């Protein structure tokens, strides 16, 4: 995956959602087509992807860890950090609001196009998830993958491997 040019993919990102005063779900805002070229061109970014929003490892460790380490990554020359998941923008936005995410930006890869382009789309049908992204992180410099951190495949002994793509591991590899 390293040295792979990210193809031009368009995501439908929902912007303008605000948390409602009555505690209900935020449903306002507009869909804005956003391309990988807009997100990654001319910048050094981290994209990490995971099987699903609101899932245990993703919600307890991975997304909160990248959010907490945001300034450390910025100090090492990273311009932005993105989380991608094969979920729609409503789910992604609700997840970020639920976790209080302010710095990590969301990529709703609802059709799995980014995951597929990177060879990371996997079949999670055995647990009724359908097609989802494997857990990974990449450092992208001006649209090209510089470094890749891909978790090993799940096994009976370790059904949700996590460590290779952790924020701590990614951070220590950036010079």
Report residues per predicted region.
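Chalcogenol-based redox active-site neighborhoods
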Residues: 1-175
């Amino acid at each position: 995956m390293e040295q792979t040019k990210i193809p031009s993919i368009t995501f439908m990102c929902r912007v303008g959602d605000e948390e409602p005063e009555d505690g209900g779900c935020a449903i306002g805002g507009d869909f804005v087509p956003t391309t990988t070229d807009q997100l990654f061109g001319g910048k050094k970014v981290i994209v990490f992807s995971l099987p699903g929003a609101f899932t245990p490892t993703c919600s307890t460790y991975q997304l909160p860890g990248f959010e907490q380490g945001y300034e450390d990554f910025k100090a090492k020359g990273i311009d932005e950090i993105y989380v991608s998941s094969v979920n729609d923008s409503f789910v992604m936005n609700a997840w970020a609001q639920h976790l209080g995410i302010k710095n990590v930006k969301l990529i709703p890869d609802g059709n799995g196009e980014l995951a597929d382009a990177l060879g990371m789309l996997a079949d999670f049908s055995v647990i009724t998830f359908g097609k989802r992204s494997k857990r990974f992180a990449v450092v992208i410099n001006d649209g090209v993958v510089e470094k890749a951190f891909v978790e090993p495949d799940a096994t009976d002994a370790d059904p949700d491997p996590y460590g290779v793509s952790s924020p701590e591991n990614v951070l220590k590899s950036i010079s």
